[in-house]
Amino acid sequence: MTKSVGDEESQYIEDPSFAAAAAFTGGRDGVSYSNQRFAEGSGHSSDLAKSLEDYRPPDEKPSSLSSVGEGGANEEEKGGNDGGPLARIQTGLFSPRLRNHRKKILSKFVLNNFFIACVCVSLISIYWGACYGTDRYFFKVKNIVVLQDAPSNTSVQSISAIIPSLLASVPGTWHIYNATSFHRKFGTTNSTEIDRKIVDLIYDERYWLALNVKPNATDTLYNSLISQDANSEFNSSIFFESVFESGRDPSSVKSTILPLMQQLEVRLQKYYVKEYLPSLMSNITSNDRDLNINMENWAIAGQLLFTYNDYRPFADRILMAPLQVGLIYCILLTVLQLSLYGKLHGEMARVLKPKHILIYRLLISWATYFLLSIGFCTVSAIFRIDFTPAFGRGGFVVYWMSTWLVMMAVGGANENVLSLVIAYCPPYLSIWLMTWIILNISASFYPMVLNNEFYRYGYIMPIHNAVDIYKVIFLNLTKRKMGRNYGILVAWVALNTSLMPFCMKFAGKKMQKNAMQAAEAAVAAATQRASRPAEANTDKNNNPPGN
């Protein structure tokens, strides 16, 4: 059956995003027939035929036109009008012909490096800023101090009485209670309930640090000083307990927040050794000159130390992999799967209806994330990470399903944005990837209380909520926030899914426009070449091509 040039041109315009490929690889019949029409001198069809002839591979072309030099003149030809091929002549970098090219190179070099410098200053500074000026935000670190000690001897001042004054010079926001006010505030009735409630407050993340000064601290010290019984020695670590959870933030609790409690300990030690204990000993000896002193008890009483109880310790360094850098790889994996499916997505887009394209893309993406997530989680299992602290033997399944949800959240955003970036500005693809990673990790790897208010956007970022969930799985932290964490991740999946049709539509229109512009440029170039003198297309015997 005869195939008209008009049909070939119609296909070229109807599917512009694949026009060049169709003309280059699948349109050989069209090329040969178009050449015949060109020889016959047809009008517009000859232009298209010439354009298709130019897109043929070099080994299939009977000849190629000479290249145009910088000044517009044809460069040196190899072969000429004897039917031999024409080719570009390569030259040196410092050739006078490349003067304009050298200017272009210099201009691009300056502009590109200026742009990269701006990216470094604007994007990377976001991450650096999350670690900068930490001491300026200590006022947001809430801590609690409970002073249960109340001496039975009213003539003796409590050891802990000075603590409120000392806290005035220690950074942080300190909430101070005695036993009575604590009972009234939190509904406890005795010392045991106070001890338990303090641990619960730290576990529920109401406070970062707690100091619990237990009852009878001063009485025990006083009795050890006046008693000859060696068993009545004063052990300060029994009465001064500091409670915290290093697992709440492995990078900052021990290195940045816990030193606040240690500052208080140092100040209290200094006061105790230089003022309180000498005054107490002086009162004891002046009131009872015949007292037989147990010098060992007096020596032991000369030191005051806190007990530091870490109820959720961060003890296994391998956990830094899934809790921090591993989440960056999680983002990158979602981009990898998108690039691997790119060619297939293009093929399916030509044969599926718009509605079914959306269904196909969602099914492929979610199924891929499902398998990617189990592979990602298996790496943690290979390195013997414990999944059981919070959910027992089901911990791995919780980790797997959570990772799948995280991948759908970050991957869906990548898929939508990258489709627009590729359509409108492909060179900036890496800029989006850097931006997405930095925005996520800057507000996730460090506690909000030690950052500027700017970083509060992190509460809605997928990686921040993933970190909170993983800390529960691996470190058995409070589950109080898990509902919010999962809700935000589901919201991301829903948002990405609802935006996908619009992103695909805008990207498709832009790519279609780009393809049409390329097609018009090709036709214009073909028209210009076809308008050259007829003798430029004849061989040395003045025979038309194909005869």
From Swiss-Prot:
The gene is SNG1. This is Nitrosoguanidine resistance protein SNG1. GO terms for cellular component: cell periphery; fungal-type vacuole; membrane; plasma membrane. PANTHER family: NITROSOGUANIDINE RESISTANCE PROTEIN SNG1 (PTHR34814:SF1). Its main location: membrane. The chain crosses the membrane at residues 109-129, 159-179, 318-338, 363-383, 394-414, 418-438, 457-477, 488-508. Induction: Transcriptionally regulated by PDR8. Keywords: Membrane, Phosphoprotein, Transmembrane, Transmembrane helix. Residues 50-62 have a biased composition (Basic and acidic residues). The modification Phosphothreonine is found at residue 91. GO terms for biological process: nucleobase-containing compound transport; regulation of fungal-type cell wall organization; regulation of phospholipid translocation. To yeast YJR015W.
